[in-house]
Every structure is written in structure tokens, then in C-alpha cells.
Regions:
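Short loop/turn motifs that initiate or flank beta-strands
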Residues: 2-276
Length: 276
């Protein structure tokens, strides 16, 4: 428990009593150090005897000169690891999130890796094998603890996206023009729907509204439930639209094609017009 206390309640075995007599014990003794060990010597400190049963009177006994020992056992810890989905069942000690029962403000780390029973997103996934997962000294000593159980919380992998289109006069960013990135391994997903950018005009934008885009299962084991678009970086580029111009004029003995003669402009968006 990270202290040198030897509580009377822990010193439950009383030896060298007469017959069936018993005594009770109160107070706290002291150990030389806080660490795990067998039959560690207890200094009496405030430990005191009190009358018990079957005729046991404290006045007939003394703790002075006796042998007083306490065994300090390793405290079992339950560890929780946490990481994003990565398409593997690897549970690395380096992804340690928390322990449940560290004492006295102590901390420990973990090394090695185990194998989880599932690779998919969930909380509290058990280990198929602890592998070589091990406790490592922090401000506390690993030797004072034992690893009882380990689980891993696997969260959704955050996707990024990028895309582009030719200027079309609207703020739509179609999923068909968007490429997803940060997928695990060789997995793929299918995206559909329409996102929204902040302006219809040519430029580079961060997609401001992804609520219209959804992801669905893809290939090579890609499950939409293991991924999220929320929190990712989503960029979209609107490129210039190429237009054509045409027209006619009378022969004038020059090679000039005056803007005023090129009166037909094609491939403009909607009812938009330009001057030349």
C-alpha cells in the first residue's frame, strides 16, 4: 500500500498464547520499508494488547521481546491500454492508458506487447495472450505489483480526405471527388454523399460540413465501424473552369482576332457571362 504501516488488523495471527486464550490488538506497527517482502520485522510503535476471550487478559502478556512479522504481498493491477484502430490485434504496453490500483500517487509504465481477441473497435477487449507484457518502474517499483489482467480500448481511426473539382458555381464537394486517406493496412472504404465548402469560387478550402458524407464497408477487411471522419483534416480544391470562345468577322487583311469578334463563350456555368 506504499506505506510502512503494519496495521493491527493485518497482524491477525497471535502466537504463544496460553491454551485457548485470545487477545485483541490495536494500533499500528512500523516496517523498515514499504516494499514487498516475506516475514518483515514489525516495530511495535503504537501496537497494544487488549483483553480477549477464554480468559485472555492483556495484563498477563507483553509484545516486548516477541517476534513480530508481516508479509507484504504484491498488489494486483488491472491495466487498460488504449489506441486507435490499426487493423491488428497488437496490444502494446506503450499504449498504456491507466492502472486501477496504484498506491500513494505512484505510477508505472509497461513494456512488451500482447494479443487482443479482436482487432475491431470496442472497449474492454480481453487479451488472447499477454505475450511479454510487463510492468516497468516509474515513480513506484514494479516489483511491488503484479499484472492481474489487461484489456485494450480500441477507438475509431480518424480519416483524412482531399479532393478537387472544376469550378461549377456551387459549394458542393461530391464524395466521388474525395479521396480518403489514413486507412489502416490495405483496407478500403466507400464514401458517398455530398460535403460543403465555404465558397463556390476557385481556391483551396477546408471542408466545413461533412454531415452529408457517409462511409461504408469496402475491401480488404475495411469496416466503416472502425473509422470516423470526425477530427480529421479534410481539404478540397476548386480549379479554374476552361471556357471556349468563338466568333466570326469579315476579311480585313490582318491576322487579328478581336475580342469583339469572339462573341460566343462556351462552357460557362449556368447563366453566368464574362467579357473578353
Amino acid at each position: 500500500d506504499a506505506t510502512t504501516n503494519a496495521a493491527a488488523s493485518d497482524l491477525s495471527t497471535h502466537s504463544n498464547l496460553v491454551g485457548s486464550q485470545t487477545l485483541s490488538l490495536s494500533g499500528t506497527g512500523t516496517l523498515a520499508n514499504k516494499h514487498v517482502g516475506s516475514n518483515k520485522t514489525v516495530t511495535i510503535n503504537t501496537l497494544a494488547l487488549a483483553d480477549g476471550s477464554n480468559g485472555g487478559l492483556a495484563a498477563n502478556y507483553t509484545l516486548t521481546g516477541g517476534t513480530h512479522q508481516l508479509t507484504v504481498n504484491q498488489r494486483p493491477l488491472n491495466a487498460t491500454l488504449a489506441r486507435q484502430y490499426d487493423a491488428t490485434t497488437t496490444a502494446a504496453g506503450s499504449t498504456l492508458s491507466s492502472f486501477d490500483a496504484l498506491q500513494g500517487g505512484e505510477n508505472l509504465t509497461m513494456s512488451g506487447s500482447g494479443t487482443a481477441v479482436s482487432k475491431n473497435v470496442a472497449n474492454g477487449i480481453a487479451m488472447a495472450s499477454n505475450g511479454n507484457l510487463a510492468l516497468v518502474d516509474g515513480t513506484g517499483s514494479a516489483s511491488n505489483y503484479s499484472l492481474n489482467s489487461t484489456v485494450i480500448n480500441i477507438s475509431k481511426r480518424v480519416l483524412n480526405s482531399s479532393g478537387s473539382k472544376t469550378y461549377d458555381g456551387n459549394t458542393n464537394a461530391l464524395a466521388s471527388a474525395i479521396t480518403l486517406s489514413n486507412l489502416a493496412s490495405s483496407e478500403t472504404l466507400v464514401d458517398s454523399g455530398t460535403a460543403t465548402i465555404s465558397s463556390a469560387n476557385v481556391g483551396s478550402y477546408t471542408i466545413s460540413n461533412l454531415t452529408g458524407v457517409s462511409i461504408a464497408d469496402g475491401t480488404n477487411g475495411g469496416l466503416a465501424s472502425n473509422y470516423t471522419l470526425t477530427g480529421g483534416t479534410h481539404n478540397f480544391i476548386v480549379n479554374r473552369r476552361v471556357i471556349g470562345v468563338s466568333g466570326t468577322r469579315l476579311y480585313d487583311a490582318t491576322t487579328n482576332a478581336a475580342a469583339s469578334d469572339l462573341s460566343t463563350h462556351s462552357n460557362l456555368v449556368g447563366s453566368q457571362t464574362l467579357s473578353l
